[in-house]
A protein has these predicted regions:
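N-terminal export signals
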Residues: 1-21
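Residue-level signal for well-ordered, solvent-exposed loop/turn and beta-edge residues enriched
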Residues: 5, 70, 183-185
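Hydrophobic residues on the short alpha-helix immediately C-terminal to a glycine-rich phosphate/catalytic loop
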Residues: 10-11, 105, 159
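Active-site-proximal alpha-helix that buttresses catalytic centers in soluble enzyme cores
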Residues: 22-115, 120-123, 128, 163-174, ...
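A broadly conserved amphipathic alpha-helix scaffold signal in soluble, globular proteins
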Residues: 103, 135-139
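Active-site-adjacent alpha-helix immediately C-terminal to a catalytic or transition-state-stabilizing loop
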Residues: 138-187
Length: 201
């Protein structure tokens, strides 16, 4: 059944996601090295003393990466390169914590802002419509490597059909999707520390 239809209708989304049989880490790594997957990467660790205002383009009015988050993003990029995981493109939310994560991990020259990846409290339209558009993007096949989408926890929960706990999808984690054109298959989560450990850095 089409995953996006479940999100839009609100039918059986939680049961579907809970029924996923996540792949073991070594199998996921092998698939990532082959390319053709979509990685929904949550921004790196943030400074929780800062409060979001919902104002776009206002760094001082947003929750930004902490020093630990900047280091995490840099190490995550190094880990992906060390693991020989090929990348075709890197798309990001315009919110600074996501854009900074993308640029620190993959280099500013590779990063392109994608409007629908915006955080739910910064959207100028409907968070549901943005999540729907992102779900379509996750279903879109990619050649020449993997596609990285740097975004936020709430939109991914909307796409999967249930709220995600911080422990389940912490800052710096990635959800791995196999695109099928008309829909997608969710393969599981990778935490940042898993990739960093696997790379031995």
């Amino acid at each position: 059944m089409h995953r996006r239809a479940l999100f839009l209708s609100g039918l059986a989304g939680p049961a579907l996601v809970q029924g996923f049989a996540f792949m073991p880490e070594d199998q996921l790594l092998a698939l990532l090295r082959l390319g053709g997957l979509n990685l929904y990467l949550r921004h790196a660790i943030t400074d929780r003393s800062q409060v979001d205002t919902g104002r776009r383009g206002d760094r001082a009015g947003q929750r930004n990466l902490s020093e630990a988050g900047r280091e995490q993003a840099t190490r995550l990029g190094r880990a992906i390169r060390a693991l020989n995981i090929p990348l075709a493109e890197v798309l990001t939310s315009e919110v600074f914590r996501a854009k900074d994560t993308a640029e620190l991990a993959f280099g500013p020259e590779r990063v392109r802002v994608q409007a629908e990846l915006i955080a739910d409290d910064y959207t100028s339209g409907s968070a549901g419509e943005d999540a729907h558009a992102t779900s379509r993007l996750l279903a879109r096949p990619v050649s020449g490597g993997n596609r990285v989408l740097v975004g936020h926890i709430v939109p991914l929960g909307m796409i999967l059909g249930r709220g995600l706990a911080q422990q389940e999808f912490p800052e710096g984690a990635a959800g791995i999707f196999r695109p099928r054109g008309a829909d997608w298959e969710f393969l599981g989560f990778f935490r940042a520390e898993q990739l960093i450990r696997a790379a031995g850095i």
